[in-house]
Amino acid sequence: MDLAPEPGWTPLTPFWEALGTRSYVSSDDDGDRIRVRYFSDDAGGTWARAVFGPGAEGPPGHVHGGALAALLDEAMGMAALSTGRVCVAGRIEVDFRSMVRLGEVVTVELALGDATPKKVPVRATLRRAGGTAACEATGLFVDIGTDGLGRAAEAAGL
Protein backbone atom coordinates (compact mmCIF):
# COMPACT_ATOMS: atom_id res chain seq x y z
CA MET A 1 0.00 0.00 0.00
CA ASP A 2 1.29 3.41 -0.93
CA LEU A 3 1.62 5.72 2.08
CA ALA A 4 3.64 8.24 0.06
CA PRO A 5 3.28 11.96 0.77
CA GLU A 6 1.52 14.45 -1.45
CA PRO A 7 3.71 17.09 -3.14
CA GLY A 8 4.78 19.64 -0.52
CA TRP A 9 4.50 17.19 2.39
CA THR A 10 7.57 16.42 4.51
CA PRO A 11 7.79 13.20 6.58
CA LEU A 12 7.63 13.68 10.38
CA THR A 13 9.45 11.53 12.91
CA PRO A 14 6.95 10.54 15.60
CA PHE A 15 8.11 11.41 19.12
CA TRP A 16 8.08 7.77 20.26
CA GLU A 17 10.60 6.88 17.54
CA ALA A 18 12.82 9.76 18.67
CA LEU A 19 12.63 8.33 22.20
CA GLY A 20 13.32 4.80 21.02
CA THR A 21 9.98 3.62 22.42
CA ARG A 22 6.84 2.22 20.81
CA SER A 23 3.35 3.45 20.01
CA TYR A 24 0.28 1.37 20.83
CA VAL A 25 -1.25 2.54 17.55
CA SER A 26 1.47 2.74 14.93
CA SER A 27 4.36 0.54 16.08
CA ASP A 28 2.98 -2.49 14.24
CA ASP A 29 6.10 -3.42 12.30
CA ASP A 30 4.49 -6.24 10.31
CA GLY A 31 1.42 -4.18 9.32
CA ASP A 32 -1.09 -6.70 10.67
CA ARG A 33 -3.11 -3.98 12.45
CA ILE A 34 -2.11 -0.61 11.00
CA ARG A 35 0.67 1.14 9.14
CA VAL A 36 0.87 4.94 9.57
CA ARG A 37 3.11 7.72 8.23
CA TYR A 38 2.95 11.33 9.44
CA PHE A 39 3.71 14.46 7.41
CA SER A 40 3.77 18.24 7.68
CA ASP A 41 2.87 20.47 4.76
CA ASP A 42 4.36 23.73 3.51
CA ALA A 43 1.82 25.71 5.57
CA GLY A 44 2.74 23.88 8.81
CA GLY A 45 -0.26 21.56 8.81
CA THR A 46 -0.11 17.94 9.96
CA TRP A 47 -1.32 14.96 7.91
CA ALA A 48 -1.33 11.18 8.21
CA ARG A 49 -1.61 8.34 5.72
CA ALA A 50 -2.60 4.91 6.97
CA VAL A 51 -3.71 1.45 5.94
CA PHE A 52 -5.37 -1.11 8.22
CA GLY A 53 -4.53 -4.81 8.08
CA PRO A 54 -6.49 -7.92 9.10
CA GLY A 55 -5.65 -7.45 12.79
CA ALA A 56 -7.86 -4.32 12.79
CA GLU A 57 -10.94 -6.12 11.48
CA GLY A 58 -14.33 -5.35 12.97
CA PRO A 59 -17.28 -5.99 10.66
CA PRO A 60 -16.19 -8.62 8.08
CA GLY A 61 -13.73 -7.05 5.63
CA HIS A 62 -13.85 -3.65 7.36
CA VAL A 63 -11.90 -1.73 10.01
CA HIS A 64 -13.07 -1.85 13.63
CA GLY A 65 -14.33 1.55 14.85
CA GLY A 66 -11.96 1.42 17.82
CA ALA A 67 -9.00 1.12 15.45
CA LEU A 68 -10.20 4.19 13.53
CA ALA A 69 -10.63 6.11 16.81
CA ALA A 70 -7.14 5.08 17.95
CA LEU A 71 -5.60 6.40 14.72
CA LEU A 72 -7.48 9.71 15.09
CA ASP A 73 -6.32 10.01 18.73
CA GLU A 74 -2.67 9.50 17.79
CA ALA A 75 -2.88 11.78 14.74
CA MET A 76 -4.52 14.59 16.73
CA GLY A 77 -1.78 14.16 19.35
CA MET A 78 0.86 14.61 16.64
CA ALA A 79 -0.88 17.81 15.53
CA ALA A 80 -1.02 19.09 19.13
CA LEU A 81 2.71 18.38 19.51
CA SER A 82 3.38 20.47 16.39
CA THR A 83 2.58 23.54 18.54
CA GLY A 84 5.75 22.85 20.53
CA ARG A 85 3.79 21.74 23.58
CA VAL A 86 3.88 18.40 25.34
CA CYS A 87 0.26 17.27 25.26
CA VAL A 88 -1.90 14.30 26.11
CA ALA A 89 -5.55 13.72 25.23
CA GLY A 90 -8.05 15.17 27.68
CA ARG A 91 -11.16 14.49 25.57
CA ILE A 92 -11.84 12.88 22.22
CA GLU A 93 -15.14 12.58 20.37
CA VAL A 94 -15.49 10.59 17.13
CA ASP A 95 -18.36 10.61 14.62
CA PHE A 96 -18.42 7.67 12.20
CA ARG A 97 -19.79 8.40 8.70
CA SER A 98 -18.94 5.29 6.64
CA MET A 99 -17.06 2.03 6.99
CA VAL A 100 -13.44 1.67 5.80
CA ARG A 101 -12.33 -1.49 4.02
CA LEU A 102 -9.27 -3.39 5.22
CA GLY A 103 -6.31 -2.59 2.95
CA GLU A 104 -7.75 0.78 1.87
CA VAL A 105 -5.33 3.71 2.14
CA VAL A 106 -6.83 6.60 4.12
CA THR A 107 -5.67 10.16 4.72
CA VAL A 108 -6.15 12.08 7.96
CA GLU A 109 -6.41 15.86 7.69
CA LEU A 110 -5.73 17.72 10.94
CA ALA A 111 -6.59 21.27 11.98
CA LEU A 112 -5.63 23.14 15.14
CA GLY A 113 -8.14 25.33 16.94
CA ASP A 114 -7.47 28.37 19.11
CA ALA A 115 -5.21 27.19 21.92
CA THR A 116 -5.13 28.45 25.49
CA PRO A 117 -2.02 28.34 27.69
CA LYS A 118 -2.89 24.76 28.80
CA LYS A 119 -5.20 23.34 26.10
CA VAL A 120 -4.90 22.65 22.37
CA PRO A 121 -8.12 21.84 20.47
CA VAL A 122 -7.67 19.68 17.35
CA ARG A 123 -10.05 18.49 14.61
CA ALA A 124 -9.41 15.48 12.39
CA THR A 125 -11.10 14.14 9.28
CA LEU A 126 -10.27 10.64 8.05
CA ARG A 127 -10.91 10.44 4.30
CA ARG A 128 -11.21 7.43 2.04
CA ALA A 129 -9.36 7.29 -1.29
CA GLY A 130 -12.09 9.20 -3.19
CA GLY A 131 -12.16 11.98 -0.59
CA THR A 132 -15.27 10.83 1.28
CA ALA A 133 -15.12 11.53 5.02
CA ALA A 134 -15.30 8.16 6.81
CA CYS A 135 -15.06 9.66 10.30
CA GLU A 136 -14.41 12.96 12.00
CA ALA A 137 -13.07 13.71 15.44
CA THR A 138 -12.52 16.57 17.81
CA GLY A 139 -10.05 16.45 20.63
CA LEU A 140 -8.85 18.61 23.47
CA PHE A 141 -5.20 18.04 24.31
CA VAL A 142 -3.78 19.18 27.64
CA ASP A 143 -0.26 20.59 27.96
CA ILE A 144 1.47 18.55 30.66
CA GLY A 145 4.87 20.21 30.28
CA THR A 146 6.89 17.06 30.99
CA ASP A 147 10.61 17.65 30.40
CA GLY A 148 11.34 14.18 29.05
CA LEU A 149 8.53 14.28 26.51
CA GLY A 150 9.49 17.84 25.61
CA ARG A 151 12.98 16.72 24.67
CA ALA A 152 11.50 13.94 22.54
CA ALA A 153 9.26 16.36 20.67
CA GLU A 154 12.23 18.65 20.07
CA ALA A 155 14.36 15.73 18.84
CA ALA A 156 11.60 14.78 16.41
CA GLY A 157 11.52 18.32 15.03
CA LEU A 158 8.00 19.00 16.30
Which residues fall in each region the model found?
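Non-catalytic linker/capping segments at the edges of enzyme domains
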Residues: 1-49, 157-158
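A conserved, well-ordered hydrophobic junction motif at loop->secondary-structure transitions
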Residues: 47-71
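Hydrophobic beta-strand-centered segment that forms part of the acyl-chain substrate-binding groove
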Residues: 70, 74-107
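Conserved positions in beta-strands of structured domains
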Residues: 39, 95-97, 109-113, 127
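HotDog/MaoC-like acyl-thioester-processing domains
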Residues: 1-16, 100-102, 113-158
